[in-house]
Structures are given as C-alpha cells and as structure tokens.
C-alpha cells in the first residue's frame, strides 16, 4: 500500500475507498454472492458458472477490510476509512481502545471514543476526504481542537484521557464527474 509509504497523501486512501464502494461492493450478485466482475469501463461480466478463479480474491476483500480502516505507527493512529467498529491498539504506553460510531456514507457524522487504563500521549490523524464540501472542525469533548481541509488529515497531538470523545462531520455534496 502506497499509503503506508506516503501517509500524508490522502489520495491513496481515497482510491482505496472508491474501489471498495464502487467495485468490491458492486460485485455482489444477489443470487450467488460475489460472483461477477465490474470492469472499470462500467460493464459487468456475468457468467453461468458459480465460481471463477477470482472468487477467492473477491471474498478476501471483506476479510481484509479492517486493515483499511486505520493505520498505526508507534503512538500515531490515522483514521482512514470510516466504519463503525472497535479497534484495540497496543501503543508504546499501553493498550488503547478506540470505538468508532458512524452511519457513513449515509451521513457524515463520526464519533471516536478512546478508552484506556491510563492517560496516553498520542497523535490522532483524521482523514478529511477530498470530496468534503468544506473544511471540517474536529471537536474533543465538545471543543474544537483541529480543523482539516478537504484532501488532508486533521492532526491532534496531546495527552488523551480515557473517555475522551472526538466528533466531526464530513460535509457531503452531490457532484457529477466524467468517467475518463
């Protein structure tokens, strides 16, 4: 993943997110699970065969989804793709649990709750997608602590306490893009 080599480049995560929503999820056949191909030219190739050589790869995507949500390095956590769930993260200072709550992409509201047995000095990087309609304020326990521009990461470096809550909302707008 190029994102691991260049973590400040949001465009790599955007490509992963776009592929997940527009290709991986779109490849599902309602009658027979994940069994047809969605080519990038917009056509879908259906077959009468139940299994193809790539069927295992399509299924593997869903098993690897947790790897796409967060990137961790030392005491820095990047929140890359938004989905409800729980991360148990072993930092240099101990275990931190991060609970993410969202209905993304149906709405842009996202909450992160941190839990630990002691305060931790951490850096949290929250992805602000390139398609966000405007800058995004990030609130810690109700107070703005960072603002992120579309196509970047909002960064919060501080000592976090157990029970801290981060809230932000990705403003979405309907846009049309030509397919090249």
Segments from the language model and where they lie:
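Aromatic (Trp/Tyr) and acidic
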Residues: 1-128, 133-135
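Short, solvent-exposed loop/turn motifs
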Residues: 95, 143-144
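Short strand-edge motifs at loop-to-beta-strand transitions and within beta-strands
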Residues: 110, 152-156
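Short, surface-exposed beta-strand/strand-loop-strand elements in extracellular ectodomains
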Residues: 134-142
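Short beta-strand segments within Ig-like beta-sandwich modules, predominantly Fibronectin type-III
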Residues: 144-150
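Short, well-ordered loop/turn sites that connect or cap secondary structure elements
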Residues: 160-163
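Glycine/proline-rich low-complexity spacer/linker segments in large multi-domain proteins
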Residues: 170-180
